[in-house]
């Protein structure tokens, strides 16, 4: 069962917390984004109502409708958890959800198109953009000062730009870089 469109992966379940069905979540990003969610989509389970959320460094604990025992929580271990994009809280300026970057054009320093962001991966120490281009796909580190997120008047992302001093070959073979 694939996650529905217009959802963002928040992280994955680490295992039970306590004996009443709490589930620890490894959170991609800020755990505060989970605190006010009314529901989450769980791999293999579908939409579940969030009864209560607790902050627990470095992630959170979710108490979900229908998950009332340690055994039920254990069954969720390793499953991905998603939120509806519309349910996510607004972020501070300069921060973006992954779903806001998907589909953005990738341009060189002169504004010429190079490809499009297909996905975003959290590799731990930095985010990687999966960019589709004429030569296939490439991983592009979302790393200043060479790769910048360009924003519009709304402050939301509009494009990804490689700077003039970006190392050659960032997008691999087949991409026409400046």
Swiss-Prot record:
Look up the domain of life of the source.
Bacteria
What InterPro entries does the database record attribute to this sequence? Answer: PRC-brl_dom, PRC_barrel-like_sf, RimM, RimM_N, RimM_N_sf
Q: Which residues form a coiled coil?
A: none
Q: Where is the PRC barrel domain?
A: 93-170
Q: Name one GO cellular component term.
A: ribosome
Family of this protein: Belongs to the RimM family.
Q: What does the comment on domains in this protein's record state?
A: The PRC barrel domain binds ribosomal protein uS19.
List, alphabetically, the PANTHER family matched: RIBOSOME MATURATION FACTOR RIMM
**Function as written in the Swiss-Prot or TrEMBL entry:** An accessory protein needed during the final step in the assembly of 30S ribosomal subunit, possibly for assembly of the head region. Essential for efficient processing of 16S rRNA. May be needed both before and after RbfA during the maturation of 16S rRNA. It has affinity for free ribosomal 30S subunits but not for 70S ribosomes.
- What does the record note on quaternary structure? Binds ribosomal protein uS19.
What is the official name of this protein in its record? Ribosome maturation factor RimM
- In which organism is this protein found? Deinococcus geothermalis (strain DSM 11300 / CIP 105573 / AG-3a)
């Amino acid at each position: 069962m694939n996650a529905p469109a217009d959802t963002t992966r928040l992280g994955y379940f680490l295992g039970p917390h306590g004996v009443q069905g709490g589930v620890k979540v490894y959170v991609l990003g800020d755990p505060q984004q989970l605190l006010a969610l009314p529901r989450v989509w769980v791999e293999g389970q579908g939409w579940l109502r969030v009864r209560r959320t607790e902050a627990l460094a470095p992630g959170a604990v979710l108490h979900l409708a229908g998950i009332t025992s340690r055994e039920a929580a254990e069954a969720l271990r390793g499953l991905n958890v998603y939120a509806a994009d519309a349910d996510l809280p607004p972020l501070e300026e300069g921060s973006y959800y992954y779903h806001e970057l998907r589909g953005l054009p990738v341009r060189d320093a002169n504004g010429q198109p190079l490809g499009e962001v297909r996905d975003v991966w959290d590799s731990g120490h930095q985010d990687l953009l999966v960019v589709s281009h004429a030569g296939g796909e490439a991983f592009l580190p979302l790393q200043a000062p060479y790769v910048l997120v360009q924003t519009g008047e709304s402050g939301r992302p509009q494009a990804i730009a490689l700077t003039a001093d970006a190392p050659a070959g960032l997008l691999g073979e087949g991409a026409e870089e400046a």
